[in-house]
Amino acid sequence: MPIQLEIVTAERVVLSEEVDMVSAPSVEGRVGILPRHEPLLTVLQPGELHYVKNGVSMPYAISGGFMEVLPNRVTILADTAERADEIDETRAEQARLQAEQAMRDRQSTEDLARAEIALRRATVRLQVAKLRRNRQ
């Protein structure tokens, strides 16, 4: 019995598909979801979201959000979500370099926190893009 997975951002429905398993970066650690999982609501942190369908793992870069789990449905409300083939590696690398520079130039703890979040997002995007490149 598959799980209905929906990944939604403010701009669009990124994915609506039946899958075999979902793995997401919760603030409490990585969470794996299989069919008939107990209901769960959790906060997601920036990281790699994977789903498995027919034995193939598909990675997405997400920048945080929420995940609602019902026995046969998972809904991801993400700040942003990108498939590996949607990521521009050059732009992601530029964002990583800018975030590192912002961390060095910080003026306050808020600046540092923003720069750390930007660095994490850029790093995740690069990791997911690398997964795509390694599969080709």
Swiss-Prot record:
F-type ATPases have 2 components, CF(1) - the catalytic core - and CF(0) - the membrane proton channel. CF(1) has five subunits: alpha(3), beta(3), gamma(1), delta(1), epsilon(1). CF(0) has three main subunits: a, b and c. This is ATP synthase epsilon chain. InterPro entries: ATP_F1_dsu/esu_C_sf (IPR036794), ATP_synth_F1_dsu/esu (IPR001469), ATP_synth_F1_dsu/esu_N (IPR020546), ATP_synth_F1_esu_C (IPR020547), ATPsynth_dsu/esu_N (IPR036771). The gene is atpC. GO terms for molecular function: ATP binding; proton-transporting ATP synthase activity, rotational mechanism. Keywords: ATP synthesis, Cell membrane, CF(1), Hydrogen ion transport, Ion transport, Membrane, Transport. It comes from Herpetosiphon aurantiacus (strain ATCC 23779 / DSM 785 / 114-95). It holds the Pfam family ATP-synt_DE_N. Transmembrane segments: none annotated.
